[in-house]
Regions:
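Domain-wide signal for the mature, well-folded portions of proteins, strongly enriched
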Residues: 24-25, 39, 46-47, 58-60, ...
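A generic structural micro-feature
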Residues: 7-9, 96, 177
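FAD/FMN-dependent oxidoreductases across multiple families
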Residues: 59-142
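Conserved FAD-binding catalytic core of PHBH/FMO-like flavoproteins
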Residues: 1-84
């Protein structure tokens, strides 16, 4: 069954791998002229990171990762890492999240740049809504289906433009753009209440 979608490519490739590091169970993200690097805690033994490297450069991905490892003093063990060929990053959002007796949720309804890590949160929000109204949805109640589409699609549209804005800002993290980013991050660190509100908004999706 076909669903109408909006979609575009980000002009970046993503690479995923696991490396050994002492991460203290803290997720981190770094921004550079190459793109973004996310380090996500993987094991409970505090010895592994899951790496997501999103790059807009055509140069060797492992060489870029080694450069970032030195630039940010990450102390990652990259000796045996295998990044493979990567995959193209693409935005896809279903314009309507139901058709006939089929309801879309999670990655079936939208796919975002992993920069902000919000794809999972949005998918969980979809599932929570479906769980709350499962009986009416199973009956294909039109009002419930339309409310689901309106409520969740609004969240998806909001996140689309938030991520596009972040991508535009951090995708030009050099010169004046770099100074603005660093200034903004320092401002947030000085005012925890604003940072907490941003985190609260992200988690509500």
């Amino acid at each position: 069954m076909h669903f109408d979608t909006e979609e575009w490519f980000y002009g970046q490739k993503a690479y995923v791998a696991v490396v050994k590091a002492n991460h203290e169970n803290i997720a981190k993200q770094y921004f550079s002229k190459f793109g973004t690097l996310a380090l996500l805690p993987f094991n409970q033994d505090l010895q592994h990171y899951s790496i997501i490297l999103c790059t807009n450069s055509t140069s060797d991905a492992k060489a870029q990762l080694e450069s970032l490892n030195q630039e940010f003093n990450l102390s990652l063990d990259l000796k045996d890492i295998e990044l493979g060929s990567g995959f193209e990053l693409k935005h896809v959002r279903a314009k309507k999240m139901f058709k006939d007796r089929i309801v879309l949720c999670g990655d079936a309804a939208n796919s975002f740049h992993p920069m902000a890590g919000q794809g999972l949160n949005l998918g969980i929000g979809d599932v929570m809504y479906i769980d709350s109204y499962i009986n009416k949805l199973m009956e294909s109640d039109l009002d419930t289906l339309m409310n689901y589409n309106s409520t969740r699609n609004q969240k998806n549209i909001q996140m689309t433009w938030i991520i596009q804005s972040l991508y535009g800002i951090f995708g030009n993290a050099e010169g004046l753009g770099e100074k603005i980013i660093k200034g903004g991050m320092k401002f947030l660190d000085r005012i925890p209440s604003i940072k907490e509100k941003i985190i609260e908004f992200a988690n509500k999706n």
